[in-house]
Amino acid sequence: MNAFANVHSLRVPSHHLRDFSASLSLAPPNLKKIIKQCSTPKLLESALAAMIKTSLNQDCRLMNQFITACTSFKRLDLAVSTMTQMQEPNVFVYNALFKGFVTCSHPIRSLELYVRMLRDSVSPSSYTYSSLVKASSFASRFGESLQAHIWKFGFGFHVKIQTTLIDFYSATGRIREARKVFDEMPERDDIAWTTMVSAYRRVLDMDSANSLANQMSEKNEATSNCLINGYMGLGNLEQAESLFNQMPVKDIISWTTMIKGYSQNKRYREAIAVFYKMMEEGIIPDEVTMSTVISACAHLGVLEIGKEVHMYTLQNGFVLDVYIGSALVDMYSKCGSLERALLVFFNLPKKNLFCWNSIIEGLAAHGFAQEALKMFAKMEMESVKPNAVTFVSVFTACTHAGLVDEGRRIYRSMIDDYSIVSNVEHYGGMVHLFSKAGLIYEALELIGNMEFEPNAVIWGALLDGCRIHKNLVIAEIAFNKLMVLEPMNSGYYFLLVSMYAEQNRWRDVAEIRGRMRELGIEKICPGTSSIRIDKRDHLFAAADKSHSASDEVCLLLDEIYDQMGLAGYVQETENVY
């Protein structure tokens, strides 16, 4: 009874009862149809009112369907309250509520309900234990006791229940127990085999996973997809590709797994290539596929391909949900088309945290600091709770605008109002904010008060601030720290050399250059940029004239420099030597 102790009796508004009674016949078939068609919780309450009036709330079949409808609206308070009024709920009613508790993430209450079920002498079914084992994944201490009950009530060799047990043990990291259940099964279907293969994949034991899969009489798509996912997770792309190519039939999950795997391994061009190959094969992508491909376009900065993929979603009836929507906002922002990013964002019917984060990050990255902060304020007004990622973008915006006091206020709010613990990115953002504003010593003090060792990003931000504000004393401190963390990074050497040269400290310049020669450090990776024109990528590197159109490019640059000079722009060349 503990599961129901905190649920008050439901009071159904009288107007619901009158309106509903007047509009339909209260026979069970009609009520069953109405419950199935309920589109809002209020209509569900009206259906319950009609059931109570005619005592049909004692009808187990009707209550089974009613509880299922309550689950879809996450209104288990209605389901529980109604069940407590039933005189003799049967196993199907209990099973419906078990499923509801598991679906709505209330595992303990499902186990408490199981105790009541046994006390009421209602015999469990196989479906009962399938739901309860899933609940035990969230409360593992009940799992072993439940397994004893499974044997007690004669379900010890039930394939579906045993398969659920395998998944339960693997979810709690007990791979040996999972394999023991699998080995003791007198019969195994494809789902049981795939679940055990997935259990090995979950603990990254791909040798065992592959060995077990090879024992199957015939691998199915689900098993192969599981193996591909596992090898991609380990970065073994060659093995994943081999398995994929050997599959006689590839479903949408197979293709999407490859696309996601390439993206996770930063092989974005391959991810996009697989997507186009998938289209050639006539496989229709789903929302997961599309959002993954759009994200790959974002990482590559290929605006034209991103626009093509976006157009495909529009022409093929994809709903602009939060997943595709946030991916599009992120893609357009990273590809430099902020106007399109804003257009997508404002046209989203629903916006989740990822959508807000994407647009705030995009605005901040493009230098629209005030707009990013206004968007953050609007996000708070709409009661969307920011996360750690949100604040990284907000601190970037504050840095661009030089809003030190606002940055301090938001930093305190992050800790006090949202209980977010500062991570290295937050500290890096604040150090960058202080350093760029010339508060070098305050930035150094913040670094000293960090609860963990600062990384190269933080010391690099301080060093850059020292360059801007010509603080050579603190620059040398930051440089020495960086030499411990990243001694082969040429950028730090060149930055300090430029500061020494600016102050005519040529002996120090020679010393740093000598150290670089001893370590074999040189600027081997010049700055590069790329542009895509007519489906061709053009890559340009600093001082590189190998491009076929380099002469035309140089002429155009000269013209741009002349126009900039006429506009009053003065080049800063003091750091060039």
UniProtKB/Swiss-Prot annotation:
It holds the Pfam family E_motif. Residues 535-565 are annotated as: Type E(+) motif. Residues 458-534 are annotated as: Type E motif. The keyword Repeat applies. PPR repeats lie at residues 59-89, 90-124, 125-155, 158-192, 193-219, 220-250, 251-285, 286-320, 321-351, 352-386, 387-417, 423-453. GO terms for biological process: RNA modification. GO terms for molecular function: DNA-binding transcription factor activity; RNA binding. Belongs to the PPR family. PCMP-E subfamily. This is Pentatricopeptide repeat-containing protein At1g06143. It comes from Arabidopsis thaliana. The lineage of its organism: Eukaryota, Viridiplantae, Streptophyta, Embryophyta, Tracheophyta.
